Design a protein with these regions (language model features):
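N-terminal export leaders
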Residues: 8-9
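Hydrophobic alpha-helical segments of integral membrane proteins
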Residues: 14-18, 22
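N-terminal secretory signal peptides that target proteins for export/translocation
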Residues: 1-4
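Soluble non-cytosolic domains of exported or imported proteins
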Residues: 35-39, 56-59, 63, 171-175, ...
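Gly/Pro-biased beta-strand-loop elements
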Residues: 40-58, 62-154
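Boundary at the C-terminal end of the N-terminal hydrophobic targeting segment
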Residues: 22-29
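Exported/periplasmic cell-wall-interacting domains
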Residues: 112-219
Length: 219
């Protein structure tokens, strides 16, 4: 899942401009019943559909600045959106290249990042047999349900917070509410291979560069 195309999208996503535009999604799209998107996620969705970059697969956009996920059908229809928990530390690069001889508990705070980029996702299971969606298997990064964690991390309270900064606590995985996983993730990314686009913490631009588009069209 680590390839030059994904790296290119990490760069491309880093150039997506923030915009003031927001609009309401379909009723029931998230916990509030009307998911408002920031411009970054909207522009990325439009770019994905314009170029067919998802290859006719379900896809998700993780907006790290807002600590939210938006999940789409292959047609581009929004299935749902919700606040998420993401990596403790801001950063857009892979902090850990492989978990060979490493454990999650061994990660330093500076290594607990959710990297930006384009990831080919696939359904799978963790070591406890729980259903998850891998988006970077080599780095042990997945989308999964909110699970029990040390009390001092206050994960349920952080998930409920309206402050995106409060929702930075994980080791790099994207953690969603249990009901959202069951109702939105499981029938889409949990059933089929897909694509996960993780938007960056840093970087702005007003358009996708022509060189990036040419590279995406290259064999």
């Amino acid at each position: 899942m680590r390839n030059s195309r994904r790296r290119l999208l990490a760069f491309v996503c880093g150039m997506v401009v923030s915009a003031a535009t927001a609009f309401a999604a379909a009723p029931g799209a998230d916990d509030s019943g009307a998911a408002l998107w920031a411009g970054d996620a909207q522009r990325t969705m439009q770019w994905v559909m314009r170029h067919g970059d998802h290859g006719g697969r379900p896809f998700a956009i993780v907006d790290k600045k807002q600590a939210r996920i938006h999940v789409f059908e292959p047609s581009g229809a929004l299935v749902g959106a919700t606040p998420v928990l993401i990596g403790l530390t801001r950063g857009d690069r892979d902090s850990v290249s492989s978990f060979v001889d490493r454990t999650v508990a061994s990660l330093m705070p500076t290594e607990r990042t959710t990297p930006a980029g384009r990831f080919d996702s696939e359904p799978g299971h963790n070591d406890k047999g729980e259903a998850i969606v891998w988006f970077d298997y080599d780095a042990a990064l997945a989308i999964h349900r909110l699970r029990p964690a040390p009390a001092h991390e206050r994960r349920p309270q952080r998930m409920a917070s309206s402050d995106p900064a409060e929702r930075r606590i994980t080791y790099g995985c994207v953690v969603v509410p249990e009901a959202f996983y069951d109702d939105v993730i499981a029938p889409t990314l949990g059933r089929h291979r897909g694509v996960v686009y993780v938007l960056p913490d840093e970087g702005t631009s007003d358009a996708m560069s022509s060189s990036a588009e040419m590279a995406l069209r290259a064999p």
